[in-house]
């Protein structure tokens, strides 16, 4: 029998996060599923859940992996059963669903968003997959609208720029771009060239080299039409705009982009996305991150999760390099600070929930 109270990291009235031992375990109804958390990962978005983004008492955290404990009466479409090892990304610090977040002993998710962890991956590796592959799928195949996907690859390869190729979203994007039949052109520091190439990049460039954008345009014969910016700063946007070919194209960021940079090239169409949009529900965070409910986004979320299941089952995608730490939720608090202070580079930070 599932306990009624649990430990979780929750928002405070002061706009921070603390460890609580008296939080309610989510009720399971409809097509939702209860999961006992075995591992969680910390993402840059977790560092942004402060101040006005905090709902007092709401559970924090996005990426998790664990074991199915309970299945709702309407959760019958995705072959999810008690005892299954699963992972995904959910929306933590959600004012509309405050009892659900990854940083808790038990969490809940609708059945269709869950990925079964294949036998060759650990809970810790599973916990690193959600945000990286969900967000990049949304960016590449919805926002940028690449004319091909991992199930039906493009027949004519074309170069796709992935800025920040050594980040967790970057290595996920490189894999997906290649599986979709395109040529991933990535940027990163020289020390990470081999890492990014090992994930499938066709060519890798040093973003700090002053000739980098001209070298990319020369290498790609000025044909880049699509750019995914996994770093999403003003300088990274400027870089992508300079690397996109003469005919223009599309640019997608993971944070709000600079309108000033956008005005420098009218032939480039900019956009920015957030992973939780794939749930199709209202995102009631402050502007500019508020979003209305969007059924079309929800439909894409169902589609893309099904694609990821197939890719995982076939062993076609692999997680970013991870650093595994013990200590459970108390240590996750320190992990959030490690990410905020940029003490972790080139690896995804994962915490075991049970020692």
Curated annotation (Swiss-Prot):
Inducing stimuli: Expression is positively regulated by the trichosetin cluster-specific transcription activator TF22.
UniProt keyword list: NADP, Nucleotide-binding, Oxidoreductase
Record-listed substrate binding positions: 131-138, 275-279
Knocked-out gene: effects: Completely abolishes trichosetin production.
InterPro entries for this protein: ADH-like_C, ADH-like_N, GroES-like_sf, NAD(P)-bd_dom_sf, PKS_ER, Trans-enoyl_RdTase-like
GO terms for MF: nucleotide binding; oxidoreductase activity, acting on NAD(P)H
Known catalytic reactions: L-serine + 7 malonyl-CoA + acetyl-CoA + 2 S-adenosyl-L-methionine + ATP + 8 NADPH + 11 H(+) = (5S)-3-[(2E,6R,8E,10E,12E)-2,6-dimethyltetradeca-2,8,10,12-tetraenoyl]-5-(hydroxymethyl)pyrrolidine-2,4-dione + AMP + 2 S-adenosyl-L-homocysteine + 7 CO2 + diphosphate + 8 NADP(+) + 8 CoA + 6 H2O
S-S bridge residues: none
Superkingdom assignment: Eukaryota
Pathway: Mycotoxin biosynthesis
Enzyme class: oxidoreductase
Protein family per UniProt: Belongs to the zinc-containing alcohol dehydrogenase family.
Protein name per UniProt: Trans-enoyl reductase
Native source organism of the sequence: Gibberella fujikuroi (strain CBS 195.34 / IMI 58289 / NRRL A-6831) (Bakanae and foot rot disease fungus)
């Amino acid at each position: 029998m599932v306990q009624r109270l649990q430990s979780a990291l929750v928002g405070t009235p002061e706009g921070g996060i603390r460890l609580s031992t008296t939080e309610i375990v989510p009720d399971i109804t409809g097509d939702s599923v209860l999961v006992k958390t075995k591992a969680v990962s910390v993402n840059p978005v977790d560092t942004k859940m402060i101040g006005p983004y905090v709902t007092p008492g709401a559970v924090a955290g996005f990426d998790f992996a664990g074991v199915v404990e309970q299945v709702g009466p309407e959760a019958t479409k995705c072959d999810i059963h008690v005892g299954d090892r699963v992972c995904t990304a959910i929306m933590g610090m959600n004012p509309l669903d405050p009892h659900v977040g990854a940083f808790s002993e038990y969490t809940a998710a609708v059945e269709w968003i869950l990925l079964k962890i294949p036998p060759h991956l650990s809970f810790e590796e599973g916990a690193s997959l959600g945000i990286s592959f969900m967000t990049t799928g949304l960016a590449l195949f919805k926002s940028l609208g690449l004319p091909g996907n991992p199930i039906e690859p493009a027949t004519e390869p074309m170069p796709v720029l992935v800025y920040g190729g050594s980040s967790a979203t970057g290595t996920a994007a490189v894999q997906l771009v290649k599986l979709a039949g395109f040529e991933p052109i990535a940027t990163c520091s020289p020390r990470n060239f081999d890492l990014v190439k090992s994930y499938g990049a066709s060519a890798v460039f040093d973003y700090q080299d002053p000739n980098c954008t001209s070298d990319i345009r020369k290498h790609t014969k000025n044909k880049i039409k699509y750019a995914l910016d996994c770093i999403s700063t003003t300088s990274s946007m400027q870089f992508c705009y300079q690397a996109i070919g003469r005919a223009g194209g599309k640019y997608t960021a993971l944070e709000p982009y600079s309108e000033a940079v956008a005005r420098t090239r009218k032939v480039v169409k900019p956009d920015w996305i957030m992973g939780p949009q794939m749930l199709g529900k209202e995102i009631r965070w402050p502007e500019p991150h508020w979003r209305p409910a969007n059924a079309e986004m929800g439909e894409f979320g169902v589609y893309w999760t099904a694609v990821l299941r197939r890719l995982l089952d076939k062993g076609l995608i692999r997680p970013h390099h991870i650093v595994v730490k013990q200590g459970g939720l108390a240590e996750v608090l320190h992990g959030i600070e490690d990410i905020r202070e940029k003490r972790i580079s080139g690896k995804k930070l994962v915490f075991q929930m049970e020692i």
